[in-house]
């Protein structure tokens, strides 16, 4: 070792601070399993990220998965894997997900080279490998240069963000990327990638924070973006469109990475006669009355819904006890009392919350479905609401005109 004292041990990558542990030793293995149990019991954590999972013993990860399933059925295991066949780690026996470094590379090089074929090929290839498993999608992290520094044209930050949230996978944001901050490795050090941030330093007119906020809302509200089948619809070096389809519904992403405007005629993935730009709809929900059935319902999405779902998720504790009474849940719904049928319907759904655990789960599920239906009605009532983009459905095609280096997320509906 560096002290030349005759003491040594195996390490990772030549770094003595990263000791290589003998996971075949029962005491070492049990120590790690009990550590997980401590964090679940003490802090009710929901998952673990395994650093350098590509060098961990497969047998240990299988045992870890089984152990965690016994602690918490929905416990999530995600591993850092750089290269290789991701399905070797992300499968029903080991990890739920791994880092999608292959797509990470395509996100910046596909834009720098004006080559959407690379990104489209990567998505299709990975779908064929991992199937229904959702990979951990990112454009940068604490180990790689910031996406802002990697992109030749900083305007491409917009379309990169859209891709992270709309392709198959689990989107993630590395702090600061929502503002588009730069960062490169310096002399082999990662510290320049991990700065302290002062929010007062960032320009409020930056469009990226609002875009990320909108994309996060859409990911929550439209299950097509999480569970929908992926269908490639349109592909050139400079333009790319795909759909996420679920139960006869579709959300279409259309992108233009060229420095000039683009006209796209995209085959419809479903029967539809109306196209709505979700990026604009979501940003204007609280200020344009015609984009929602009424203002109180719109505000309820931003205020009462999060409180309600937080309480609903805690209704049943680890030992099965009821933590909140129905009255507590009803308080979270006060903002939904609009006098409309929707408000009454939600009220009725929560009438029997105290009956049984099964009934509670059913009610919560029905509430989510009702909220999704209400949101869809609001979207359909909102009109095209385009913001510089042009959308039209004609002769079985979605006609999209996009400005330079911009994209849209479109909800297709059949009125």
Each predicted region: which residue ranges?
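Substrate-binding/active-site clefts of carbohydrate-active enzymes
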Residues: 1-42, 64-70, 87
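Active-site-proximal helices and loops of the catalytic beta/alpha 8
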Residues: 35, 41-44, 51-135, 153-154, ...
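Short, solvent-exposed helix-loop connector elements
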Residues: 147-152
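Substrate-binding cleft of secreted/luminal carbohydrate-active enzymes
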Residues: 168-182
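Carbohydrate-binding surface patches
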Residues: 233-269, 311, 369, 405-408
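Long intrinsically disordered, low-complexity regions that are acidic and Ser/Thr-rich
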Residues: 288-377
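C-terminal beta-strand-rich structural cap/linker in extracellular carbohydrate-active enzymes
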Residues: 296, 379, 389-415
């Amino acid at each position: 070792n560096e002290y030349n004292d005759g003491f040594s041990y195996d390490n990772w990558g030549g770094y003595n601070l990263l000791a290589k542990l003998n996971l075949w030793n029962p005491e070492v293995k049990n120590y790690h399993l009990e550590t997980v149990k401590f964090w679940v019991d003490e802090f009710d954590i929901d998952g673990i990220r395994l650093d350098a999972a590509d060098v961990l013993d497969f047998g240990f990860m299988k045992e870890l998965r089984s152990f965690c399933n016994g602690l918490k059925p929905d416990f999530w295991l995600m591993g850092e894997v750089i290269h290789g066949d991701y399905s070797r780690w992300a499968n029903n026996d080991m990890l739920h997900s791994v880092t999608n470094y292959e797509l990470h590379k395509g996100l910046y090089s596909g834009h720098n080279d004006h080559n959407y074929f690379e990104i489209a090929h990567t998505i299709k290839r990975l779908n064929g490998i991992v199937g229904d498993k959702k990979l951990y999608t990112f454009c940068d992290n604490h180990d790689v240069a910031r996406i802002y520094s990697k992109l030749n044209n900083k305007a491409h930050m917009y379309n990169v963000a859209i891709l992270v949230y709309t392709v198959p996978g689990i989107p993630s944001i590395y702090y600061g990327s929502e503002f588009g901050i730069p960062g490169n490795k310096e002399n082999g050090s990662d510290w320049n990638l991990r700065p302290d941030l002062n929010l007062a330093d960032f320009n409020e007119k930056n469009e990226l924070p609002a875009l990320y906020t909108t994309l996060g809302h859409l990911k929550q509200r439209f299950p097509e973006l999480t569970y929908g089948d992926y269908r490639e619809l349109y592909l050139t070096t400079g333009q790319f469109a795909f759909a996420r389809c679920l139960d006869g519904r579709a959300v279409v992403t259309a992108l233009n990475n060229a420095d000039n405007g683009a006209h796209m005629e995209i085959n419809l993935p479903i029967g539809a006669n109306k196209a709505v730009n979700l990026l604009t709809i979501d940003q204007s929900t609280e200020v344009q009355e015609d984009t929602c059935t009424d203002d109180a319902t719109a505000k309820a999405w931003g205020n009462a819904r999060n409180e309600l779902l937080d309480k609903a998720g805690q209704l049943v504790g680890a030992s099965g006890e009821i933590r909140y009474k129905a009255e507590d849940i009803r308080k979270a719904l006060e903002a939904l009392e609009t006098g409309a049928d929707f408000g009454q319907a939600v009220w009725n759904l929560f009438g029997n919350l105290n009956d049984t655990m099964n009934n509670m789960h059913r009610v919560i599920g029905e509430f989510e479905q009702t909220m999704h239906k209400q949101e869809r009605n609001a979207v359909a009532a909102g009109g095209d609401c385009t913001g510089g983009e042009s959308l039209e459905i004609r002769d079985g095609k979605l006609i999209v005109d996009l400005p330079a280096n911009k994209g849209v997320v479109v909800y297709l509906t059949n009125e």
